[in-house]
Regions:
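Short pre-active-site segment immediately N-terminal to the catalytic Zn-binding motif
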Residues: 196-197, 294-314
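Beta-sandwich interaction modules
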Residues: 87-112, 122-127, 131-134, 485-495
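Propeptide-to-catalytic entry region of secreted or membrane-anchored zinc metalloproteases
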Residues: 54-78, 144, 152-273
């Protein structure tokens, strides 16, 4: 098991980066276009079942050792899907490559962080030096310069006569660093139409929160509405020769697809980022001022005010926020290896990845119509393949709009929400003392597969160490450690299901500490 040895500054500090992506003659170019530092949450790594190739963003020390690593979406890959407005079934599915894109990521930025690299999908484990050249490298000096420039731009914007955007909190269940925060922003609404936008936003948000999946996880969510006026009302409809001057350049018929609604993602991030911190914008949904049917997924979800807009957006958020696979046929099919998504598989037996949810009386493989819809089984067809790929239920929202999510998808969503539900424990250590988390009975945590995030903040001048232990057949074993010359440490560990506990140890010095941790749900 790889173990990380981290040295970090006394004061916990993270950096949020907005990185532009563009295609150049010599390959893909990455450039930081915005940066800010603060005590906000780290970006959760994409689930192991996330579809498509991913970029890895790593923070290194001066020796080149990886201190932190996170998987982010490859924004150059875009899967396009168009649903039938009458039946909810898929009409068209296609993969396209975007020349330009943008993504945001939050990483530790302690004193020992010397650089941030972007790597190809095959990457190094935490604590081991990379053996492949990075796609991009940003040294600390350039990042600190970008932080200063971004702060100056934001200060100048706040000093303007009237802010371009305003924000309203609709649902507030707790601190943003321990919640999945949803942002709904309107495009193509003029200043005179702000009342209409606010009414439209209420319809969409109420529709989201009425969905059983979101209603069940309401306690783990915050929802905000961002208002910004466009110069003109409506949306570009390129196929009809209609063009509008809007805040985020919303347009139908992008990629020559009638029902595809796209926006300028850089403008979206800039506008939302001007009024919300990194913790407050986990999932962004742009609502265009049009009743034309359409929408899209990707890093940012889009929808119109068509009566079916909520259904389209819910499916797309299944991709954007929860990394769920499509469960329909049609498109580019591949069955050479096990899909990484948690709701599709090439395994047609009871040992399939969701096998624990299959009742003994349910036949496997499972024939369509043989059991009630929603019954978990092994149904042929999914992830664009009519044969060789299997899905857990006959019909779910990831196959046809208007259907429930069902148990397997609900469980995968619960895992993602669990990454935002951090536990905070405080205490006091004397020199040489040891404390454990959790400090309540039974003294350990039962966790599932996924990423474990632990952050320790202690008193200045002290040296505290942080360790993560797992129960193995041979006893408790230390699987990750953060050990430096200060009292602030962090662990980002990808582990398997089992029992865990955290140890905080004073190497020297005494005082109060805070340990914050989140683990994948069992």
């Amino acid at each position: 098991v790889a173990m990380a040895s981290l040295t970090v500054a006394a004061q916990a500090q993270n950096i949020s980066l907005r990185v532009s992506v563009s295609e150049g003659r010599s390959g893909v170019n990455f450039a930081p276009i915005h940066a800010e530092v603060g005590d906000f949450a780290l970006t959760p790594s994409l689930p192991g079942h996330a579809p498509g190739q991913q970029w890895r963003v790593v923070a290194r020390d001066a020796a080149g050792t990886v201190l932190h690593e996170v998987a982010v979406k490859n924004t150059q890959q875009r899967h396009i899907e168009v649903f039938n407005p009458k039946t909810g079934a898929i009409d068209m599915s296609r993969q396209v490559k975007q020349a330009d894109g943008v993504f945001e990521v939050s990483l530790p930025f302690n004193a020992d962080i010397a650089s941030v690299d972007v790597l190809a999908p095959a990457s190094t484990n935490v604590g081991i030096k990379a053996v492949t050249a990075p796609l991009a490298k940003f040294d600390r000096a350039s990042l600190e310069k970008k932080v200063g420039a971004s702060k100056m731009m934001r200060t100048q914007s706040m000093a303007a006569a009237a802010p371009a955007a305003t924000v309203t909190t609709v649902v507030n269940t707790g601190p943003s660093n321990a919640r999945m925060d949803y942002v709904f922003i309107g495009d193509g609404y003029t200043a005179a139409e702000m009342g209409k936008w606010q009414a439209d936003a209420k319809k969409v948000i109420d529709g989201f929160m009425a969905d059983p999946l979101f209603a069940a996880n309401r306690a783990n969510m915050n929802v905000r509405r961002v208002d910004i006026a466009s110069n003109q009302s409506g949306v570009d409809e390129i196929d009809k020769g209609i063009y509008r001057d809007t805040a985020m350049d919303g347009e139908f018929y992008c990629y020559n697809i009638e029902r595809l609604l796209c926006v300028n993602e850089t403008k979206v991030y800039n506008i939302v980022g001007s009024v919300l911190s990194p913790d407050q914008r986990d999932v962004i949904v742009v609502i265009s001022n049009s009743t034309r049917y359409g929408g899209s997924g990707g890093a940012i979800a889009t929808a119109s005010m068509n009566t079916s807009s909520v259904e389209v957006a819910l499916h797309e958020i299944g991709h954007t926020a929860f990394a769920l696979a499509d469960e329909y046929e049609g498109g580019t099919c591949g069955i050479s290896s096990e899909p990484t998504e948690g709701n599709v598989s090439i395994n047609r037996t009871r040992s399939v990845k969701w096998g624990s949810k299959i009742a003994a009386a349910t036949p496997v493989p499972t024939t369509v119509g043989s059991v009630a819809n929603g019954t978990v089984g092994v149904f042929q067809g999914g992830r664009y393949c009519s044969n060789g790929i299997y899905r857990p239920t006959e019909n779910s929202r990831m196959r046809t709009l208007g259907y429930p999510w069902h148990a397997v998808n609900e469980g995968l969503v619960k895992t993602v929400f669990g990454k935002y539900t951090a536990v905070t424990q405080t205490g006091t250590l004397s020199s040489g003392g040891i404390a454990y988390a959790p400090n309540t009975s039974p003294g350990y945590i039962q966790a599932g597969n996924g990423t474990f995030n632990v952050q320790l903040t202690g008193p200045a001048g002290a040296d505290f160490d942080l360790s993560l232990y797992k129960s193995l057949s041979t006893g408790w074993s230390k699987v990750a450690v953060s050990r430096g010359n200060t009292s602030s440490e962090s662990i980002n560990y990808v582990g398997t299901a089992g029992y865990y506990y955290i140890e905080v140890k004073s190497y020297s010095g005494s005082g109060s500490y805070t340990v914050k941790y989140s683990v994948p749900p069992k």
